[in-house]
Amino acid sequence: MGLFKFEDLPVNTLVGTSLGTFNKVTYGGKEVDKKYKSKYRLSKFVSAILTPMYKINDRMAENLPPIEGVKDPVFIIGHWRSGTTFIHNVLSQDPQFGYCSTYQTVFPHLMLCGRPFFRWCMKTVMPDSRPTDSLELNPDQPQEEEFAFTNMTPYSYYHFWMFPRHIAEYRRKYLLMQDLTEDELSEIKRCQKSMIDTALHVSGKKQFLSKNPPHTGHVKALLELYPNAKFIYMMRNPFTVYKST
């Protein structure tokens, strides 16, 4: 049983990012409300402490040999609450697929080193279920990689969880892919490929299974990376989706 509920966690998931990325995400006109100051400071402190390990891990990832016989990735897309988590959990039972785990989304820079210890830490403190629908949570379950991107790059839609006042900007740039610079787009693509390659190495699989609702707006960029990628688009009664969301 996890020690904390979501609302009681002393840190947020930015503990899994490097200090440099942490600063890029939190600076630039971002304001932290008074009641979240302690969580902000502790998250930044943990990020600073772990950043040297993150750099070691990233060097290891850069030196991984290419995987032979890799198959085209499969991307599960669709609006939130349309059944993407369900189909992801079902298809991930197929042994041919590798995927991004909950641990890997929080600590994408610790996928190759330090994993046993930090996985234990995460399992000890994390809540047992999602607050939105009470689905079980554990470090090894399949998870959407957008949460990993929040810790790999300052260019993620899910940063609105930390700074909801800026959701319009995040939505325009990192969900709809509008007004992106070439450097931002290149960095987003690099993170996507790095996540898939490293996850496949860790799992020993040949085909990546992705579930990421924000990818619904990223299909063009994904096809530029993976021209033969497969997509599963989840559809559900829009009234039910709206009510659930």
Predicted regions and their residues:
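Charged, amphipathic alpha-helical linker segments immediately N-terminal to NTP-binding catalytic cores
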Residues: 2-52
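N-terminal signal-anchor transmembrane helix
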Residues: 55-76, 107-109, 114-117
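Glycine-rich phosphate-binding P-loop
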Residues: 76-93
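Short His-Asn-centered micro-motif
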Residues: 77-79, 209-213, 235
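Post-Walker A helix-loop "phosphate-sensing" segment adjacent to the P-loop in P-loop NTPases
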Residues: 93-103
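PAPS-dependent sulfation machinery
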Residues: 106-208
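Ligand-binding pocket scaffold of soluble enzyme catalytic domains
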Residues: 195-196, 211-212, 219
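Conserved phosphate-donor/acceptor-positioning beta-strand/loop module used by diverse small-molecule
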Residues: 211, 222-245
